[in-house]
Each structure stands twice: as structure tokens, then as C-alpha cells.
């Protein structure tokens, strides 16, 4: 699920990135990203559309569908809840250490 979240978040920020640049920014192989993009497309979370970047070259743009936006929002909330819990646990641990001194 982290992979899906990373890809959805990055697509939302910059839908016109090439697969190669997107894979590089995420630290994934091109094959892994391609597999993930196709899975997200099959789930109806993204649309992949063609556009011409110049006269000779066709590129793709990756767009979140309403379902993709919903999933990204839910994953963002879970991510933030997990980070808040980690912060609270670290703060409690730090408090224990300080009181022992």
C-alpha cells in the first residue's frame, strides 16, 4: 500500500512526469513502476492519457480518478495517524528518560 500511496501522491503533484522520471523520483525500477501504474489503472484509480509533447513524440499524462483521489485521501489520513502515534510514543519515551535523570 505504501507503493500505491507514493505513486498516487506523486501523480497528483505532477501528472505530466514521464515514467522514467517518476520511477527515478520514487526510487523504483521502471518495470516496478510500470506494473504499479497498470495495477492502479486496472483498479480504476488512475487514467493514462496520451498527449503530444512535440511534433514527433507522444507522452502520457497520469490523472487520478475520483476513486483515486478518495483512496489517496484515505491513505494520507492513515499515514498521518500513524505518524502522530509514533510522535506521541516518542514523546512519552522521552518524558520517561527525562524523569529518570
Predicted regions located by residue number:
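Amphipathic alpha-helical dimerization/coiled-coil segments
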Residues: 71-101
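Alpha-helical residues within the helix-turn-helix
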Residues: 24, 42
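Key DNA-contact positions within bacterial/archaeal DNA-binding proteins
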Residues: 20, 31
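Short, cationic-aromatic polyanion-contact patches
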Residues: 1-3, 18, 49-73
Amino acid at each position: 500500500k505504501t507503493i500505491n500511496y507514493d505513486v498516487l501522491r506523486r501523480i497528483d503533484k505532477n501528472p505530466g512526469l514521464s515514467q522514467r522520471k517518476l520511477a527515478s523520483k520514487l526510487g523504483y525500477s521502471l518495470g516496478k513502476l510500470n506494473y504499479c501504474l497498470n495495477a492502479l489503472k486496472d483498479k480504476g484509480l488512475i487514467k493514462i492519457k496520451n498527449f503530444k509533447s512535440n511534433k514527433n513524440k507522444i507522452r502520457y499524462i497520469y490523472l487520478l480518478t475520483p476513486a483515486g483521489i478518495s483512496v489517496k485521501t484515505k491513505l494520507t489520513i492513515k499515514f498521518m495517524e500513524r505518524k502522530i502515534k509514533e510522535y506521541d510514543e516518542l514523546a512519552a519515551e522521552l518524558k520517561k528518560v527525562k524523569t529518570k535523570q
